[in-house]
Regions:
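Short, well-ordered strand-loop elements centered on a beta-strand within folded domains, enriched
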Residues: 70-77, 121-123, 174-177
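Short glycine-rich anion-binding loops that position phosphate/pyrophosphate groups of nucleotides
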Residues: 40-42, 114-118
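N-terminal active-site beta-alpha-beta segment that forms phosphate/nucleotide-binding
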Residues: 1-104
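Surface-exposed, charge/polar-rich loops and edge strands
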Residues: 4, 95, 104-109, 117-121, ...
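Glycine-rich, N-terminal phosphate-binding loop of Rossmann-like dinucleotide-binding domains
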Residues: 38, 113, 172
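Receiver (REC) domain switch-region micro-motif
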Residues: 34, 109-110
Length: 177
């Protein structure tokens, strides 16, 4: 159902509205480091977020999928969007950059999803990349799930390995939920 709904959404416009909501948040203003996914076509556009993080002097880290089929990724600090090239699954990933062992305390993590429910259960693409990321890197700073309002459902199924989000950690084009 979420995949069908996504096809009718203008992810560029939704991403632009989310970006404006994000830039008004204290979590954005206070973060010295931002971890952000590089959006795919069917996700809210994060280009302006990546550009602003770099322009404002924030340390910007993006994910790079590791070889193999175990759903792992690493954090890579980039200094330019020119550092990105299509990688695994056709997703833009860093072709160089410095691998980061852990996010510093207070770093802001921006996480994608296919959908989320009102209790914070996140539906991803099924490979567990971001659940492993959140568990492995022990996010100590704020985290926000970027999800279009149309894809916030009353309830979704959860697995025991799913990392939950709490109220106040879901950002839509209408603000924080």
């Amino acid at each position: 159902q979420a995949k069908a709904l996504r096809k009718n959404l203008d992810m560029h416009a939704i991403g632009a509205a989310m970006t404006q909501q994000l830039f008004a948040l204290p979590a954005w203003r206070q973060a010295g480091t931002v971890f952000c996914f590089v959006s795919m076509r069917d996700e809210p556009d994060t280009t302006a977020i990546l550009q602003q993080a770099l322009a404002s002097g924030k340390r910007l880290c993006v994910p790079r999928c590791l070889p193999g089929n175990d759903g792992r990724m690493e954090l890579v600090e980039i200094t330019s969007l020119n550092d990105l090239q299509p990688g695994r699954y056709g997703i833009l990933e860093p072709c160089g950059g410095r691998t980061i062992a852990a996010l510093e305390p207070g770093a802001l993590a921006l996480i994608p999803c296919l959908a989320v429910d009102k209790q914070g259960v996140r539906l991803g693409r099924g490979a567990g990349y971001y659940d492993r990321f959140l568990t492995r890197f022990g996010q100590t700073g704020p985290k926000l799930l970027l999800c279009p309002e149309a894809l916030v459902f009353p309830a979704l199924p959860a697995d025991e390995w799913d990392v939950p989000f709490t109220p106040g950690e879901i950002l839509t084009e209408n603000g924080v939920r």
